[in-house]
Amino acid sequence: MTVAPVYKQGWTLDDVHWSLFDPKRIEPSLLATVKAAALVEYNAPDYVTYLKRVFAGTGPETIAAIEQWGREEAQHGRALGRWAEMADPSFKLEEAFARFRKGYTPEHFDGSDDVSVRGSRRGEMIARCVVESGTSSYYSAIRDASEEPVLAEIAGRIAADEYRHYKLFYDLQHAQPEPELGFWKKLSIAVGRVRESDDDELAFSFYCANVPPEQEAATPYDRKKFSKLAGRASMAAYHRKHIDRLVQMVVKAVGANPHGWLARLAGILLWRRLETRSI
């Protein structure tokens, strides 16, 4: 039985065993999804700016934690991008990211409002828990699916970070001096954030990462088309256990039993939804 390594917080790109890279073991669908993921992770500074506005006045420790989270997320993007550049020398992280940033910026990132788009700081942290649940399970799936050793290591390191980020936001949710949100309100926020996975962020990042600039005219961006392609590439890595873990973390964030009926039902529905998106 192989025991997966335990990756601690605070790693850098120098800790990754790049010399073990094996181009013969690259899986094309994983390469496509890693390219897109690199752009999303590398976009962390915008999220940091937004969260610092929302949490202004909460104290230096909270702001420092948000800034540290952002540094780690951006590092994830650099690590994934470096691997993708090794796997496909035609891919350039900075060039693809510039195209992505030019075409994708959520409205609440551009504003100056210090109120969360979720309605409260607690609501914002529930949404962040949903995201970290998704990324933790996603990189766990890539780690388990990859036969290329460097990608498996990077994905394992990122998955461990994302789980720690989930715990950070879970604790911050309960630390806010705001009224406790009701269960149905929390569930509504969580479901709403899950549905946002159909927005332009994932589809457009997949487009920018996998369609070279010189092919833009022949292959224009179509959200529905590239959302489906992104979903298909992701499903190549996922197994049901990864979805079940994701759902358990989300259900815990909204205050329900992570091993109860809601988690079981949500796991079935989400798995079916992902299968449908990838067809």
Where are these regions (language model features)?
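Non-heme di-metal
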Residues: 1-279
